[in-house]
Structures are given as C-alpha cells and as structure tokens.
C-alpha cells in the first residue's frame, strides 16, 4: 500500500485559512454562527412592523447573508454589517458591493456606536452578552431594539421572543431600550 505525502505548505495554508475565518473566536470567544433561513424570515417579519426608514446593524455579520437579505427586502432602510474575521469581512464586503443600502465595516462590535441604529442584531455566544447589554443600555436610544439570536442576557428577561427552532438556533430574543429613568 502506497502512502501519499502531502506537502507541508498545505498544513500551513489550512491553518492560515482557519485563522482568517475564526479570528473572533480567539479574542472575543465568539465563533462563527450563521443565521439560518428561518431566523432571517422571523427578522423580516419583525422589521416589517417597524416604521421605515430603518437603520439596522448586524454585529458580527459573518458572510453578510442576513444583512444582505434584509437590505434587499427593505430598500428604504440602511443596513450595516460589522466583522473582524479578515476572510469573512472580505467575503461580506464583496457580497454587498452592489447593494446600495448595505455596507460592511471592518470593526469590532465594541467600537460600533449603537446609538446610530434602530435595531441592533447579534448572533454571538453567551460570553459577551452581559457586556453587550451594558453597552446597549449606555448607547442605544429609547425605543430602539436589541435582538439576539439564541443567546439570552443573563438576568434580563426579553421583552419579546420569536420562535426560530432551526438547528441550534432556538429563538430571537428582543429587548426594547427604555429611557434612563426606567433602567
């Protein structure tokens, strides 16, 4: 039986590709989670209840599937995706180039001014949720919404929950920002 030896550079290439895709996992403990079709449909249903024009940001947009789909569905809105994994950012940026109301920024979610948006969407991990909640409370305007796919904010009941039941995605959890006197 003959053994095929792979060139050493293939292993290095594989490592570099994994690093370029999983950059967030190392620093932020947020792996790549892509929103499924049912989650996108539930987001579309929810956004159709909002007053246009709408400003929406996807924190950690991956390949921009969700933000691009929503931008196509709601042409009067402004849709922004932020991503720090280099390869995912490049793919997302290329996908959104021709969609006028969609833009992708190479930026950490912690550098985004959440007050610019009516809806802030994320599909992160349990690790950053409390920190994100503190950031949302400090920056988001009264009446704006924070939406998390699957991951709840510990100790903070959602104002609304939309069932997704698709693979590992269970629900969209929605919190409406209240005025400072109510927090």
List each language-model region with its residue ranges:
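N-terminal auxiliary segments of SAM/dcSAM-dependent transferases
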Residues: 1-21
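Membrane-proximal soluble helical/coiled-coil segments
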Residues: 27-139, 145
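C-terminal substrate-binding/active-site "lid" region of AdoMet-derived donor-dependent transferases
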Residues: 128-183
């Amino acid at each position: 039986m003959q053994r095929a030896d792979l060139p050493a550079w293939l292993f290095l290439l594989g490592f570099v590709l994994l690093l370029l895709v999983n950059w967030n996992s190392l620093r932020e403990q947020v792996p790549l989670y892509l929103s499924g079709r049912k989650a996108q449909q539930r987001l579309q249903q929810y956004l159709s209840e909002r007053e246009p024009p709408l400003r929406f940001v996807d924190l950690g947009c991956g390949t921009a599937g969700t933000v691009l789909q929503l931008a196509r569905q709601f042409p009067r809105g402004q849709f922004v995706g932020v991503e720090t994994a280099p390869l995912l950012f490049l793919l997302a940026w290329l996908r959104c180039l021709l969609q006028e109301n969609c833009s992708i920024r190479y930026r950490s979610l912690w550098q985004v001014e959440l007050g610019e948006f009516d809806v802030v969407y994320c599909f992160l991990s349990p690790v950053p949720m409390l920190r994100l909640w503190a950031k949302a409370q400090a920056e988001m305007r009264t009446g704006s919404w924070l939406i998390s796919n699957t991951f709840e904010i510990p100790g903070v009941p959602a104002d609304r929950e939309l069932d997704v039941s698709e693979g590992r995605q269970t629900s969209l959890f929605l919190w409406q920002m209240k005025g400072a006197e109510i927090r």
